Design a protein with these regions (language model features):
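Hydrophobic/aromatic-enriched cytosolic interaction surfaces used to assemble or bind macromolecules
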Residues: 1-150
Length: 150
C-alpha cells in the first residue's frame, strides 16, 4: 500500500493480504479447487446475485480485512502528514474484481479507480486491447521499471 502526492511516493507499507485470500475463501467455502474458485471470482466478482451472491459473501470478510489495512494506512498518513487523501487507486490483480471500485468508494467515501499506468507510458497499438485488464496488475512493475536510478 502506498500514498503518493505530486507524483512522488510519500508513504508505503506492506500487507500480507491479497486477492489470493479471496480465491482461497471461495475454494474453502464452496469445497472446490483453487482454479475453479479463481474463475468464479473473476467472472462474478462482488456483483453476484441469486445463487452467485454466495461467492461475494465468501470474499467480503477477507476484502474487509484488506480495506481495514488500507484504512489504517490512510488514517496514519493523514495524522502524520496532515494531508487528506483525495482518492484511492486500486492496483494488483484484485483491482480487476468486478464491483470492487464501487465497494471501495462506498467504504471510504472517496473516489476509487483502477490503476491505468498505460495512459502515462507509450506502448504499441497492438497491446491496446489488453491494457485495460493488464494495467492494474502490472502497475507496480511498470512503475519500478520506469524508476530512474542515480
Amino acid at each position: 500500500m502506498a500514498v503518493a502526492a505530486g507524483g512522488l511516493l510519500k508513504y508505503s507499507t506492506q500487507t500480507d493480504f491479497s486477492g489470493g485470500y479471496l480465491t482461497q475463501a471461495i475454494a474453502n467455502g464452496l469445497g472446490i479447487n483453487v482454479r475453479r474458485a479463481e474463475e468464479l471470482k473473476r467472472r462474478r466478482g462482488l456483483l453476484g446475485s441469486g445463487g452467485e451472491y454466495e461467492v461475494s459473501t465468501l470474499m467480503l470478510p477477507y476484502l474487509d480485512v484488506i480495506l481495514g489495512e488500507a484504512r489504517r494506512v490512510k488514517n496514519l498518513y493523514e495524522k502524520n502528514y496532515r494531508e487528506k487523501i483525495e482518492r484511492i487507486i486500486l492496483a494488483g490483480g484484485g483491482a480487476n474484481l468486478l464491483g470492487v471500485e464501487k465497494y471501495v468508494a462506498e467504504e471510504f467515501r472517496l473516489p476509487a479507480l483502477k490503476a491505468s499506468p498505460f495512459t502515462k507510458i507509450g506502448h504499441l497499438p497492438l497491446i491496446a486491447p489488453f491494457t485495460g485488464n493488464l494495467g492494474a496488475p502490472l502497475a507496480v512493475s511498470l512503475g519500478l521499471g520506469m524508476r530512474r536510478t542515480n
